[in-house]
Amino acid sequence: MKLATGLWVWGSLLVAARTVQPSASQSVCAGTENKLSSLSDLEQQYRALRKYYENCEVVMGNLEITSIEHNRDLSFLRSIREVTGYVLVALNQFRYLPLENLRIIRGTKLYEDRYALAIFLNYRKDGNFGLQELGLKNLTEILNGGVYVDQNKFLCYADTIHWQDIVRNPWPSNMTLVSTIGSSGCGRCHKSCTGRCWGPTENHCQTLTRTVCAEQCDGRCYGPYVSDCCHRECAGGCSGPKDTDCFACMNFNDSGACVTQCPQTFVYNPTTFQLEHNFNAKYTYGAFCVKKCPHNFVVDSSSCVRACPSSKMEVEENGIKMCKPCTDICPKACDGIGTGSLMSAQTVDSSNIDKFINCTKINGNLIFLVTGIHGDPYNAIDAIDPEKLNVFRTVREITGFLNIQTWPPNMTDFSVFSNLVTIGGRVLYSGLSLLILKQQGITSLQFQSLKEISAGNIYITDNSNLCYYHTINWTTLFSTVNQRIVIRDNRRAENCTAEGMVCNHLCSNDGCWGPGPDQCLSCRRFSRGKICIESCNLYDGEFREFENGSICVECDSQCEKMEDGLLTCHGPGPDNCTKCSHFKDGPNCVEKCPDVLQGANSFIFKYADQDRECHPCHPNCTQGCNGPTSHDCIYYPWTGHSTLPQHARTPLIAAGVIGGLFILVIMALTFAVYVRRKSIKKKRALRRFLETELVEPLTPSGTAPNQAQLRILKETELKRVKVLGSGAFGTVYKGIWVPEGETVKIPVAIKILNETTGPKANVEFMDEALIMASVDHPHLVRLLGVCLSPTIQLVTQLMPHGCLLEYVHEHKDNIGSQLLLNWCVQIAKGMMYLEERRLVHRDLAARNVLVKSPNHVKITDFGLARLLEGDEKEYNADGGKMPIKWMALECIHYRKFTHQSDVWSYGVTIWELMTFGGKPYDGIPTREIPDLLEKGERLPQPPICTIDVYIVMVKCWMIDADSRPKFKELAAEFSRMARDPQRYLVIQGDDRMKLPSPNDSKFFQNLLDEEDLEDMMDAEEYLVPQAFNIPPPIYTSRTRIDSNRSEIGHSPPPAYTPMSGSQFVYQDGGFATQQGMPMPYTATTSTIPEAPVAQGATAEMFDDSCCNGTLRKPVVPHVQEDSSTQRYSADPTVFAPERNPRAELDEEGYMTPMHDKPKQEYLNPVEENPFVSRRKNGDLQALDNPEYHSASSGPPKAEDEYVNEPLYLNTFTNALGNAEYMKNSLLSVPEKAKKAFDNPDYWNHSLPPRSTLQHPDYLQEYSTKYFYKQNGRIRPIVAENPEYLSEFSLKPGTMLPPPPYRHRNTVV
């Protein structure tokens, strides 16, 4: 908390905080907690420092030395031997720090919650003055906290000190030391110092007391031998082996001896087996044992404490303030500002003032600042309603200090503290317990009940309208002679007197707090309550009083008011009445004579005589009497006797017994009926269950059944070819699947569990199979089957191009903006599908995204994925290794995984793509990632990304999971960007980039080296169901832009090809495929033998994720060959004839059925079968043809008409700058065949209508309506991945790299 500048103009404030001398040899003084705050007057700053610490040996708190000039005498600091808090030396200009006798810094409080010793910025920027030597030659122990020495321009020798010998726990995270070698004027240590010293002479050598000790020593030592070990209670070294030879104590100092605990109040006597009072008991006060606690502390058991706990109340016994358990409800004690529940609060404000309702005691401080009274817009805190300040009218004690720097302008006094009796000063603010500063509207203080300020000084200044302050005798409030007063720059006393603002004439010379007889510190004559009066009502008045010294006390209510001139009472209580109002029982006046009193052997009854005095009845009277004899006893009217005869008592007793038995019977019957009814309910419920009368499930969850199919493969159908990877739990092979009874060969990845793994690994293996078999989406890998051999085998489709991380790294010079954004959309759609299926992936990263083709990626690696139940919203992991750098903060701290935590991983994955395979947080140890994220650091903006793309990443990395976007929103956002890619990603030469042939991939080449793949068939191609054969239709090209559209000067944005959905209709034969129904193909072959033809093109032509294109002349059906040619068409680009020949462009440049116009050629690219790329005869293939990478500028040659050329994104440069727009001269298509592409049903699979694109819900439709068979991939297991880290490895102590991932100071 910083004070205003005006506060620090102290004048002659001399602070003496010395409070107690625990022993004859050591004096204790209070520390400060000002940090870098200082007085505006440097002279006063020095004088305050000197008064604080002169002749002080133990600083109970922090030692802060700041803003001291170079010519000041600091020799008074030599007396300090111990500091319980931290030592701060900053912003000074002196040359030498004379803390020569300081031996131990306990570090009970740390500077910036980290350092016990902080020394920095001790030099003058425009001069040659500054700290040169640390005179800490006897400092040998820092019990808690680290050392920070930095930016001391002239400081020497600090880098030679062996700080690890001084610091008890020298963790790298709290040790910071900047080298001072090379500073001007620095010399070397004396030769006897062995290179470690505080100064240049032999008297400045560092004394090592820990690192030089024998191994048998469990603490410090005074020599290298076993016999030189210090006592285990010693701290900072010793001069001998005894507990009285310690330089400082580890725990407590009991009259010079270091002990584990102070002598207790009670000790056990083994002879009497009893706890007996210990006459040598002492109280613990800090690190000392004292016979008496300081006057402003409270005794709790055997300790000196600042405040009693909530279950106890503060009482005073024999002049000692003690904490005693409350007999009933404790008086309400509330936490003050800066303590307990208000630890982080800086001022009383509208957000916390209600916590002070009905409080009688404040354990801590009350602080009123401008941000509390007038509000804090920055923190959205409203101004305080002045009426709410009345909650402090119940406060009687403040154990800390009262600091008022701002007050409501419409309040002219502090009357809300009218019941405040004591300001304890157990915590001081720069030595102050009462501070009132710059309150221009205050005219009087009105602390009318204040009787004591136990400790600390008073500072009241710059209150221009304040009066009455000069009349107060402040010393009557002080408990010690060392307390001081600074009161100045308030309203002049003569001006107050001139306006009549003076004390009431009934006030004594001690002064007053304000106008009126109720504001006096003491009364000149008499007082009634808080009001001073001239005389008591002894002989007249509405109510009568008696004098108790100078206090008028009202007579007891049983005293009869006497006539004027006569005393009604002469003391307190009903026994001092002159005459009773009602009756007199012995010496006391009572309202009536007592009916019954407990005597020694019987009850006693009394009656009143004619003088209204009470007397006892005759002993035979058992129910009262009217006189002294037995005949005056009270009789029962029906017997005529004073007591009831025996025969009259019998019926009453009998009636009572009968009534009691009747009640018992009723209760027993009621209980029996209750038990019977409960038993009948149970039987009926069981009968209904056995008779199947239940119409609803016992535990309805609302979750749909998982109807995914699991294919069981025989071991004879699988052939292993090559090991692709292995780990702790299994091995991944490249293999071939030959379905039983078929002639096709399908390349697959086979994941085999090791034989040495246990049952738990088998269960986890099958859990992964469950997840993979449950997904069915174009951008998610799906399980092909499971082989239940002795070692379980998972079979997935083999991905020809490896993982996306390696792919972008290998081809980073040839990847354009369109392709990057397409990948972002595909990954988002895949994750959106997982979210709809309540699957949490937990391990999304670029390494876990596979490349089926350059334009089609799939998410894989479900080894960490978990399926949430119907009522679950999050998954709690129990252990294992985790990819920390890809995980959200809640996953790292609490191991809670949700779909929103997958969004965080998605943002990191996109960052990897945009940096072409960059490593997130490269160079930073994984265990330090949580701290960096909590401090607000995130991955930097990739160079190619505009702010639009980067802001999407940043939204994915919000700390609040609910603030992150949904995958649905991410897919919509990146779809929008993909329609205009060069606006959002800036890549040099983007429009000229040509993605290399898929066959050029290193991963792909490695797969082809060891097996003849001519007869291979892609797994998805094999899994497409064969319903019937359809004649191969003749396809036509689609017109993208007509000439009329170009004439109006509107150029449509580049289009993004959507990745889901397909719908096209054949007009031949009446066969049609609708959405969600895969289209079978008829096998065809070329009639020109010279033309190389790509075989086995997949059905991905109708998958929305395809972006490659092929163009080929129509061919005729061929005879049946093997099972693969019987199942599919070799050319998937053969489309149905047009359905509607009339079409025109919509606003986005897409076709809508309208009318015929001349059109340019538009191609929807499709994928090639990645495994059919070479022929045995060595003919030139389409993918090996140089023409693959560029388009011809003229008409195609006749011999090239049948060449299959994939069209990759960003490989054509035309006027539109879009890979999907091709020049007229590129390909020639017969005019009669151009209308097929105008069929709206054909284009429905490519892109939804514009109205749908502009609505984010279109992603729901296009991501969940269609289901496809998926492939597999290969990855190293988690145990071998360096990006995964066990939660037990997250420990502090790792080096931080340079910025931007660390703070300014380095760690050593």
Curated annotation (Swiss-Prot):
Residues exposed to the Extracellular side: 26-651
Motif (PPxy motif 1): 1032-1035
Keywords, comma-separated and alphabetical: Activator, Apoptosis, ATP-binding, Cell membrane, Developmental protein, Disulfide bond, Glycoprotein, Kinase, Lactation, Membrane, Mitochondrion, Nucleotide-binding, Nucleus, Phosphoprotein, Receptor, Repeat, Signal, Transcription, Transcription regulation, Transferase, Transmembrane, Transmembrane helix, Tyrosine-protein kinase, Ubl conjugation
BP GO terms, sorted: cardiac muscle tissue regeneration; cell fate commitment; cell migration; cell surface receptor protein tyrosine kinase signaling pathway; cell surface receptor signaling pathway; cell surface receptor signaling pathway via JAK-STAT; cellular response to acetylcholine; cellular response to epidermal growth factor stimulus
Keyword Nucleus: yes
Binding annotation for ATP: 724-732, 751, 797-799, 843-848
Leading EC class: transferase
Catalytic activity line of the entry: L-tyrosyl-[protein] + ATP = O-phospho-L-tyrosyl-[protein] + ADP + H(+)
Post-translational changes noted in the entry: Isoform JM-A CYT-2 and isoform JM-A CYT-1 are processed by ADAM17. Proteolytic processing in response to ligand or 12-O-tetradecanoylphorbol-13-acetate stimulation results in the production of 120 kDa soluble receptor forms and intermediate membrane-anchored 80 kDa fragments, which are further processed by a presenilin-dependent gamma-secretase to release the respective cytoplasmic intracellular domain E4ICD (either E4ICD1/s80Cyt1 or E4ICD2/s80Cyt2). Autophosphorylated on tyrosine residues in response to ligand binding. Autophosphorylation occurs in trans, i.e. one subunit of the dimeric receptor phosphorylates tyrosine residues on the other subunit. Ligands trigger phosphorylation at specific tyrosine residues, thereby creating binding sites for scaffold proteins and effectors. Constitutively phosphorylated at a basal level when overexpressed in heterologous systems; ligand binding leads to increased phosphorylation. Phosphorylation at Tyr-1035 is important for interaction with STAT1.
A family per Pfam: PK_Tyr_Ser-Thr
Gene3D superfamilies membership: 6.10.250.880, Hormone Receptor, Insulin-like Growth Factor Receptor 1, Chain A, domain 2, Phosphorylase Kinase, domain 1, Receptor L-domain, Transferase(Phosphotransferase) domain 1
Residue ranges constituting the Protein kinase domain according to the UniProt record: 718-985
Subcellular location: Cell membrane
Signal peptide: 1-25
GO molecular function: ATP binding; epidermal growth factor receptor activity; epidermal growth factor receptor binding; GABA receptor binding; neuregulin receptor activity; protein homodimerization activity; protein tyrosine kinase activity; transcription cis-regulatory region binding
Tissue: Preferentially expressed in the developing nervous system. Exhibits distinct and highly regionalized patterns of expression in the adult brain, where it is mainly found in the reticular nucleus of the thalamus. Very low levels in kidney, and heart.
Record's bilayer topology term: Single-pass type I membrane protein
Residues linked to a glycan: N138, N174, N253, N358, N410, N473, N495, N548, N576, N620
Residue(s) carrying Phosphotyrosine: Y875, Y1035, Y1056, Y1150, Y1162, Y1188, Y1202, Y1242, Y1258, Y1284
EC assignment: 2.7.10.1
Motif placement: PPxY motif 2: 1298-1301
Short sequence motif PDZ-binding: positions: 1306-1308
GO cellular component annotations of the record: basal plasma membrane; basolateral plasma membrane; caveola; dendrite; GABA-ergic synapse; glutamatergic synapse; inhibitory synapse; mitochondrion
The family this protein is said to belong to: Belongs to the protein kinase superfamily. Tyr protein kinase family. EGF receptor subfamily.
Protein name, UniProt field: Receptor tyrosine-protein kinase erbB-4
